[in-house]
């Protein structure tokens, strides 16, 4: 009895199941457990050079849910500092960054809003935010936006962190607020006027926190 080519291949090819998701984060085990990080939710306000880097590093850490908010389009002058590239020029930053995050973790859940944080619909935040599982990250280089974001984070019992650089990277500024602790809000600590990058020199002392433990701290948001 003659055998077809298909019969030969059926015997020779052995398929093995491949756990893509588990393999992607296999090097994180014992440091950042996927089962913990996958439930975390991050709202990125401002998807520029800082916001895109923060989002991608959190995606690599295993964070499973993102809400990206930014009104801007990728332009050529963004490329030298942004995590997205020339192929993304002309598209919204939220779309370009979303593709990058999906390329790291195909199972990541992403919500997008084309606009500034002050215009984020409450219904969208209500659906996305989960108390003690959500963190707001302010990367808009705007104090008024960070003040507003911190107020929202308090409303949703979520942690808040603001990240920015002063003019010509003279210094970096990181502020964080964790609900339920005796900590000043952003407005009380830093005020609400101007852009962070417009600061040319320090006129008061701020906690400058550059640490590799930032992602690990996210696992303890509770």
Predicted feature locations:
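Single conserved hydrophobic/aromatic residue that forms the stacking wall/gate
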Residues: 1-9, 210-222
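Glycine/serine-rich phosphate-binding loop and adjoining beta1-alpha1 elements at the start
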Residues: 3, 7-40
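Glycine-rich adenosine-cofactor-binding loop
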Residues: 33-63, 70-73
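Short, surface-exposed basic-aromatic patches at helix termini and helix-loop junctions that form
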Residues: 59-62, 126-131, 147-159, 178-180
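Glycine-rich phosphate-binding loop and adjoining beta1-alpha1-beta2 segment
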Residues: 73-105
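A structured beta-alpha segment of the ubiquitous adenosine-cofactor-binding alpha/beta core
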Residues: 98-133, 140-142
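ADP-ribose/adenylate-binding Rossmann-like module
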Residues: 135-173
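Adenosine-phosphate binding glycine-rich loop
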Residues: 178-212, 220
């Amino acid at each position: 009895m003659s055998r077809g080519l298909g019969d030969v291949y059926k015997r020779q090819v052995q398929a093995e199941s491949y756990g893509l998701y588990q393999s992607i984060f296999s090097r994180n085990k014992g440091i950042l457990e996927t089962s913990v990080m996958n439930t975390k939710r991050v709202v990125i306000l401002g998807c520029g050079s800082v916001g895109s880097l923060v989002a991608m590093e959190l995606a690599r850490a295993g964070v499973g849910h993102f809400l990206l908010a930014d009104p801007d389009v990728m332009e050529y002058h963004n490329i030298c500092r942004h995590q997205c590239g020339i192929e993304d020029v002309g598209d919204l930053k939220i779309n370009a960054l979303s593709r990058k995050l999906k390329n790291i973790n195909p199972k990541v859940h992403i919500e997008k809003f084309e606009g500034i944080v002050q215009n984020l619909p409450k219904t969208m935040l209500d659906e996305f935010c989960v108390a003690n599982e959500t963190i707001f990250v302010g990367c808009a280089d705007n104090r008024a936006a960070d003040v507003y974001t911190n107020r929202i984070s308090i409303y949703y019992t979520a942690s808040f962190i603001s990240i920015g650089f002063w003019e010509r990277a003279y210094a970096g500024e990181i502020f964080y607020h964790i609900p339920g602790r005796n900590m000043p809000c952003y407005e009380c600590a830093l005020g609400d006027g101007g852009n962070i990058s417009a600061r040319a020199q320090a006129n008061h002392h701020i906690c400058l926190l550059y640490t590799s433990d930032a992602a690990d701290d996210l696992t303890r948001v509770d």
